[in-house]
UniProtKB/Swiss-Prot annotation:
Stored InterPro entries: EF-Ts_dimer_sf, Transl_elong_EFTs/EF1B, Transl_elong_EFTs/EF1B_dimer, Transl_elong_Ts_CS, UBA-like_sf
Subcellular location: Cytoplasm
PANTHER family: ELONGATION FACTOR TS, ELONGATION FACTOR TS, MITOCHONDRIAL
PROSITE patterns in alphabetical order: EF_TS_1, EF_TS_2
Family named by the database record: Belongs to the EF-Ts family.
Region (Involved in Mg(2+) ion dislocation from EF-Tu): 80-83
UniProt protein name: Elongation factor Ts
Length: 283
């Protein structure tokens, strides 16, 4: 039996919003596997969804740049919004992006090594930790990018589309957060995991398994549509799907990348009272 630590319970509470005892029970039943605990809590109805894990938990900027038939996107993190707007921090991020584009670098460790000296100097000057977090590139016939402030950046690659359409698609991706291009692109493990969750929920309604399975088939079609770009309602004209929009223009999306500042990073919250108490004991 895995040890159920306080930190593990705290993480599950933050990710689900459930009570401490419910989290501890779920972790015990899942033998300490937090992902399995979340699945079980969804199935039991203890939570409706486990989406808090994607909450923004760090600051910084997203930068994008298109160079011919290749586009790059970069995330550089700092600790506060104040520093994220600092001219020196912005210039550092721009310099890192330019280096990635010039050298066609998509390995973040290469960029970290190349800019470590400058990063350390900037940390000393600004007084906050700075991290070159991730970089990616996208190739395509027609490329478009969109930035929502400095916190969300999107790249889209398409065929048969003009620049205006690709820009609109990038804006859609920024707003609607699709995970795949088409419903058929949704990976088998994601489909299977969601299918089992939905089947358990349907079975709990007391319906026969055959009817429950038919109910789940409809839900799965809706699910794969919701998480895919072409299956989503187009944000600028919700009466049609993105797939219908592309068909009207005889165009196709070949790929996209969406970065949001701090997604997936847990922000450390300082307990001021505990910190003061600890300092008192040391003195």
């Amino acid at each position: 039996m895995a040890e159920i630590t306080a930190s593990l319970v705290k993480e599950l509470r933050e990710r689900t919003g459930a009570g401490m005892m419910d989290c501890k029970k779920a972790l015990t039943e899942a033998n300490g596997d937090i992902e399995l605990a979340i699945e079980n809590m969804r199935k039991s109805g203890a939570i409706k969804a486990a989406k808090k894990a994607g909450n923004v938990a760090a600051d910084g900027v997203i930068k994008t740049k298109i160079n011919g038939n290749v586009a790059f996107i970069l995330e550089v993190n700092c600790q506060t919004d104040f520093v994220a707007k600092d001219a020196g921090f912005q210039a550092f991020a721009d310099k890192v992006l330019d280096a990635a584009v010039a050298g066609k670098i998509t390995d973040v460790e290469v960029l970290k090594a190349q800019f470590e000296e400058e990063r350390v100097a900037l940390v000393a000057k600004i007084g906050e930790n700075i991290n070159i977090r991730r970089v990616a590139s996208l190739e395509g016939d027609v490329l478009g990018s969109y930035q929502h402030g400095a916190r969300i950046g999107v790249l889209v690659a398409a065929k048969g589309a003009d620049e205006e359409l690709v820009k609109q698609l990038a804006m859609h991706v920024a707003a609607s957060k699709p995970e795949f291009v088409k419903p058929e692109d949704v990976s088998a493990d994601v489909v299977e995991k969601e299918y089992q969750v939905q089947l358990d929920i349907a079975m709990q309604s007391g319906k026969p398994k055959e009817i429950a399975e038919k109910m789940v088939e409809g839900r799965m079609k809706k699910f794969t549509g919701e998480v895919s770009l072409t299956g989503q309602p187009f944000v600028m004209e919700p009466s049609k799907s993105v797939g219908q929009l592309l068909k009207e223009h005889n165009a196709d999306v070949t790929g996209f990348i969406r970065f949001e500042v701090g997604e997936g990073i847990e922000k450390v919250e300082t307990d001021f009272a505990a910190e003061v108490a600890a300092m008192s004991k040391q003195s």
